[in-house]
Design a protein with these regions (language model features):
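Beta-propeller-forming repeat regions
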Residues: 1-170
Length: 170
């Protein structure tokens, strides 16, 4: 979340502040603990808390987008129905109930340009597993099996298989 500190950061509801990947405290403040989302086109996570999307500025979470007409799917964590890389580039979409008619879903996607060209996140097996766990168990955001963030040089090329065309020629 913080481009000033390379690597993953961690925080929780049970401890004060944010810690870097070495366990060093980097902030006395912390963002919400609901969901992380790739949204605005840089390589840092954004924070999704209810229907508010925030960007960490090194000291606090600043709202960059709200999802009008959206309703979260539970009362305790206020999570989306699902967050996933569903369409287009590598950034994620969020799906919420329609606030006026919960029998309908609303899908939100970003229109912010990005200079980063990555393949769809669904090619990563760990990420696909994360999409499945959102709807079969404890609703948590998906995570990649590799690092995306400040200093990204190369990401592993996905193992992709296609059907053999000669199977269809018989």
């Amino acid at each position: 979340i913080d481009p000033n500190h390379r690597g993953f950061e961690m925080w929780s509801s049970g401890a004060p502040g944010i810690y870097n990947c070495k366990g060093e405290k980097i902030s006395d403040n912390k963002p919400g603990i609901s969901f992380r989302v790739y949204w605005d086109g840089d390589l840092q996570d954004e924070i999704l808390n209810g229907t508010n999307l925030s960007k960490w500025n090194g000291n606090k979470a600043v709202t960059i987008h709200t999802f009008p007409g959206a309703m979260h799917c539970n009362g305790t964590k206020r999570t989306p129905n699902v967050s996933a890389d569903l369409f287009g580039d590598w950034r994620e979409e969020v799906v919420f109930y329609d606030a006026n008619d919960p029998s309908k879903l609303r899908i939100y996607t970003t229109t912010i340009p990005t200079e980063h060209r990555l393949y769809t996140l669904m090619h990563d097996p760990m990420y696909r597993l994360g999409i499945a766990w959102q709807n079969t168990g404890y609703n948590q955001p998906p995570h990649l099996g590799f690092y995306i963030g400040d200093g990204l040089k190369n990401i592993p090329w996905p193992e992709m298989y296609t059907p053999r065309s000669d199977l269809f020629d018989q």
